[in-house]
């Protein structure tokens, strides 16, 4: 197999076929696939050989270099739905043993697994709309797909700039929840784990179920797959989601006092982060396609969670229909803008905004994110850094695929240069963020705190897990061994927890104990002076 791959390189250097690019080296890793005279199709994986050249950050990678990151067999197929119309294809592949068995391997520094994607951006001429979403969300929630930019060669043909990307699935290093097996048919074992998604069914009707409240909302089984999940398991997760819908559309949907409201079923923190990212990107397919949800076992806090984010190539002003290009307005109202579409966002997104605690938490989370992760300066710096890294490879990509200055379904903006595409992305993000600053519902009163008289008294507190549903641990190490006070305030500045704790190195557990779900502020104090503070989310 190594010889076959080396032969592919030799043929590529001396005969580029129909490629417009003579490709010899790159600052990005190089992925080389040999199909052995087969055709990659979308209905079944074919067995091919693959090698990866990656000499490390700051080092150049040459087509004549040995495969030093991976060399072996894969099963590969074309992936995507509407994206299959584009000449630059994306691929799903599985790393395998010579016997054809799935083989977990680490690729380009990402944790070992066997399910991968080679994503080739086409209508997204910035080459980074998916990637910026995954990058930002990785700092917000437990898991977001990892990726590494690379350049792809198939059978001697230069294919362009790609992202080698993790496929969403249940795994310790991906969506880290329990994995169902055939014995998990009752009790706690039946309650998780599940990954489902709201999407367009691509197979038979058995692959999905329809919301009893909206015929245009389809839920698909993702992991376990539709052909793996057992009837009892499929019925359980369907009943759970329906119970959530029954509650959220019911008359007492908030019911924070009685504990019977929607918070009984969902991790509100993940719903908030999902909502903010969907609205920030204003993805034209937002909420109604490629929208993942997952649930762990009840014994592990198994409420329904939203995420990870997926499929943002037609986001951030990159679609010319249904007002997706407009930096004003809400994407969750898609059905009122384009009522004729066969799919629509679940109405629960609008319903949740009728809960004042939820909108308080939403506003506070947004304000916090805009100070760091989602600040315009932070996002612009990331975009500029990626554009710089891709400066060389994007030229080859757009030589092979000469679409700069050309309309591709469904571009709203058509830049004549790569830099114009990058600048438009930055402008759109800034404009959209500022509109959300002014129009996001909810209020977030700030708690006034004293500034430490001696700045050297400040310390760092680690809170985990955060958000939490039963208890959280506050860990810190302060040089002064005197007694400290931990105070937790609600959004109106009212004390809900006050606990005296020892100084020095300390780990203190705070239990929920009837405190309502929502966002709170904690302050670690010494003699009345705040030496550390932060935000806390209780589910």
Stretch-by-stretch model annotation:
Residues 58-63, 298-303, 528:
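Short, solvent-exposed loop/turn segments that connect beta-strands within catalytic domains
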Residues 15-19:
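Sec/Tat signal peptide C-region and signal peptidase I cleavage site
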Residues 4-13:
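Sec-dependent N-terminal signal peptides
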Residues 20-274, 327, 379, 403, ...:
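Phosphate-handling architecture centered on phosphoinositide signaling
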Residues 27-29, 38-41, 46, 80-82, ...:
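Middle-to-C-terminal accessory/interaction subdomains
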Residues 5, 455-464, 468-539:
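C-terminal outer-membrane/trafficking sorting elements
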Residues 161, 302-305, 460:
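Conserved catalytic motifs of the protein kinase core domain
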């Amino acid at each position: 197999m190594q010889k076959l791959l080396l032969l592919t390189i030799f043929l590529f250097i001396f005969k580029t076929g129909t490629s417009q690019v003579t490709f010899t080296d790159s600052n990005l890793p190089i992925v080389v696939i040999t199909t052995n005279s087969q055709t990659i199709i979308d209905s079944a994986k074919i067995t091919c050989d693959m090698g990866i050249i990656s000499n490390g950050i700051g080092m150049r990678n040459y087509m004549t270099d040995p495969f030093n990151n991976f060399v072996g067999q894969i099963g590969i197929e074309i992936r995507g739905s509407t994206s299959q119309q584009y000449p630059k294809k994306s691929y799903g592949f599985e790393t395998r043993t010579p016997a054809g068995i799935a083989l977990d391997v680490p690729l380009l520094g990402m944790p070992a697994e066997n399910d991968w994607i080679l994503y080739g951006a086409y209508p997204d001429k910035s080459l980074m709309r998916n990637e910026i979403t995954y990058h930002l969300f990785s700092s917000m929630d437990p898991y977001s797909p990892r990726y590494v930019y690379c350049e792809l060669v198939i059978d001697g043909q230069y294919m362009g700039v790609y992202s080698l990307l993790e496929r969403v699935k249940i795994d310790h290093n991906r969506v880290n929840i329990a994995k169902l097996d055939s014995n998990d048919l009752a009790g706690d074992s039946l309650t998780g784990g599940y990954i489902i998604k709201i999407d367009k069914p691509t197979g038979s009707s058995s692959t999905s179920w329809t919301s009893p409240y909206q015929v245009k909302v389809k839920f698909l089984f993702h992991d376990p797959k539709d052909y793996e999940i057992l009837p009892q398991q499929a019925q359980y997760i369907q009943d759970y989601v329906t119970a959530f819908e029954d509650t959220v559309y019911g008359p007492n949907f908030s019911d924070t006092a009685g504990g019977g409201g929607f918070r009984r079923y969902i991790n509100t923190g993940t719903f908030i982060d999902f909502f903010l990212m969907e609205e920030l990107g204003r993805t034209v397919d937002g909420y109604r396609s490629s929208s993942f949800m997952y649930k762990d076992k009840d014994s592990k806090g198994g409420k329904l969670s939203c995420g990870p984010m997926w499929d943002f190539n037609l986001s951030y002003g990159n679609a010319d229909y249904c007002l997706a290009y407009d930096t004003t307005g809400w994407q969750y109202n898609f059905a009122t803008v384009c009522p004729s579409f066969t799919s629509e966002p679940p109405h629960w997104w609008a319903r949740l905004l009728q809960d004042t605690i939820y909108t308080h938490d939403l506003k506070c989370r947004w304000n916090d994110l805009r100070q760091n992760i989602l600040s315009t300066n932070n996002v612009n710096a990331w975009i500029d850094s990626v554009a710089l890294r891709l400066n060389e490879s994007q030229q080859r990509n757009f030589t092979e695929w000469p679409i700069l200055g050309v309309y591709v379904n469904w571009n709203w903006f058509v830049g004549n240069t790569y830099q114009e595409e990058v600048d438009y992305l930055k402008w759109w993000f800034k404009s959209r963020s500022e509109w959300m600053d002014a129009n996001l519902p909810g209020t977030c009163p700030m708690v006034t705190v004293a500034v430490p008289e001696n700045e050297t008294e400040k310390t760092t507190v680690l809170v985990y897990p955060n958000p939490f549903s039963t208890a959280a641990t506050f860990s810190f190490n302060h040089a002064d061994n005197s007694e400290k006070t931990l105070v937790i305030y609600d959004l109106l500045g009212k004390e809900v927890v006050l606990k005296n704790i020892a100084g020095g190195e300390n780990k203190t557990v705070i239990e929920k104990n009837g405190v309502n779900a929502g966002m709170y502020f904690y302050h670690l104090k010494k003699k009345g002076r705040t030496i550390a503070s932060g935000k806390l989310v209780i589910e």
